[in-house]
Amino acid sequence: MSRAYRQQYGCNFITAIPNNLYGENDNFDLENSHVIPALIRKVWEAKINKEPSVFCWGDGSPLREFTYSEDIAHILLFLMENYNEPNPINIGNTDEYSIKEIVEMVCDIMGYDGKLEWQTGQPSGQHRKPSSNQKLLDLGWKKEGYTSLKEGLKKTCEWFIMKYPKVRGVS
């Protein structure tokens, strides 16, 4: 669609494709949120309710790429100055983490020491969904411009704890 508008109206419309986003102000509803906000909420509520375990779907092995929401904002500003092509561009961080690694990081950040119980009867999802951000890097975006998953999770968890229970999807 952006290509058609670009051609028809002569405007610099581009298509920037992120991967899995997370960060403050996300949707933390357990029924329809994405994996990271759901895990943050599950772990926090298990901690404050002194529950001995957190139940997670699947076996934790699928690998996913995640990008902190503030990084996407910076990348979009970068693209406004550096990209004027009709073809889509992938803009997400391509570091892969297993769901198990993510849950363990969230537990560590939140100080939850209960047990993780994997519900292997539930779907784990596709094992990998890799993307390539090489075009973005070729434009001059630096890999160091991405917030590490651990740092982004820390910021998101701290925000969630500070705002709980008045966060989207909880209150």
Residue spans for each PLM region:
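Active-site Tyr-X1-5-Lys
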Residues: 1-19, 38-49
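Flexible, glycine-rich beta-alpha linker
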Residues: 14-38, 62-63
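Alpha-helical structural signal
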Residues: 18, 36, 40, 73-76, ...
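C-terminal substrate-binding subdomain of Rossmann-fold SDR/epimerase-dehydratase oxidoreductases
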Residues: 45-171
